[in-house]
Amino acid sequence: VVVKDKKGNPIEGLTAKDFIVAENGVPQAIRFCEHQELAGAQSAAPVAPSKPEDIKIYRDLARTRISPETPGNIRYKDRRLLALYFDMTAMPPPDQLRALAAAQKFIRTEMTSADLVSILRYSGGAVDVLLDFTAERNRLLSVIATLIVGEGQGSDESTDDASRSDTGAAFGQDDSEFNIFNTDRQLAALETAAKMLGQLSEKKSLVYFASGLRLNGADNQAQLHATIDAAIRSGVSFWPIDARGLVAQAPLGDATKGSPGNMGMYSGASALAVTTGFQQSQDTLYALAGDTGGKALLDYNDLTRGIVEAQQTVSSYYILGYYTSNAAQDGKFRRIKISLNSNLSANLDYRQGYYAGKQFSKFTAADKERQLEDALM
C-alpha cells in the first residue's frame, strides 16, 4: 500500500492499527504490517561506478533461482526489486539487440543504490533465472553482454557451478503440448516467472521485453486470466516494453511476407488486416500492464524509458498481510478496500482485489483444459 499526502509525499510511521482492510465489505484482521522506505527515484541520483567496468563474456550462463526470504534476512528490506525478463521466443534478433541495449543503458546510467536487478530469460520452453537480484553492475552487464554475443562464444567460466545443471530452469510446455491445448506459451511462461518472484513479500516490477503478444482465440483467455491472477497474488506488476519501438509499416506488409493478392490489395482490406494484426499484438501487453498495476511502453524507440518508469513508480510503501475470513472456493473476484483508521487525509494506492481459488465442480471448459495441461508439465 502506497500512502501519500496531498502534496504527493510518502507518509511514514504508520502501524497495523492505522489501517482498515475490508474484503467484499467484510473487515479483516491485519496480521502483518511492514514499512519499506525507499528514496524517490527522481531524487536518488544514479550511482557512478567506483571502479572501471570489468565485463566478461561467459562461455555458459548460470541457471540459478530467486533466493527466497528467510527469517531475519533483511536483504530485500528497503530495496527496489526490478526483474528484467527477455522473451526470446517473441523477439526477432534485431529486437533482441534493442532490448538488451536498453537494459545495458539503464544499468549504466539510471540504476540507483536502492535498486536490485534480476535477469530472466524465456527460451527453449523454459524460464531461466540467469541472475538473482543483485546490485553488482559488472555481473549484470556481463550476463547481458553474453546474451548479445551468444553462449558458447566466450572464454570465461561461469562463477556458478549450477551453470552445468538443469536444476535452475523452470519447465515449460513443449511445442506438441501447446499445439494440442492451444495455449499461448508466452503467457504460461510469464505466469511461471510471476510465481518465482512470489517467494518474496516485497513489491516486484517485472519488465517484460517482447515484440508484441497476440492471443490465439478465446481459449487463451483462461491463460491470460491465470497469468494476471498469479501476478496479483505474487505482488508482481508487469511493465511490458514493445521491443519493436515505433514502427512504420508498409500498407501490404514488408518483404518478409508474400503479396496478399486478391481484391484486398485494391479495396484496402489487406492493409487494414496488417494494421489490425499489429494493434492486436499490443492489446495483450496493455492488458497485462493495466490489470497488474504496471504500464506498457508502446510505439517508443527509447526502450530504456520503460524500465525507468517502472523504477520511478516504486516509492516507499507498506506491506499488509491478512488471512481471509471467506473460505469459499468459488473462483470469484474479491474486492479489497483499504482505508486509514485515523483522521489522516491521504491518498492510498493498492491492489484492488484478487480471484479466489475454484473447486473443480465450478471449472469451465477452459479451466479444465488448463488443469490437464498443468498435470502434463
Set out the residue ranges of the language-model regions.
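Scaffold/interface architecture of coatomer-like assemblies
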Residues: V1-M377
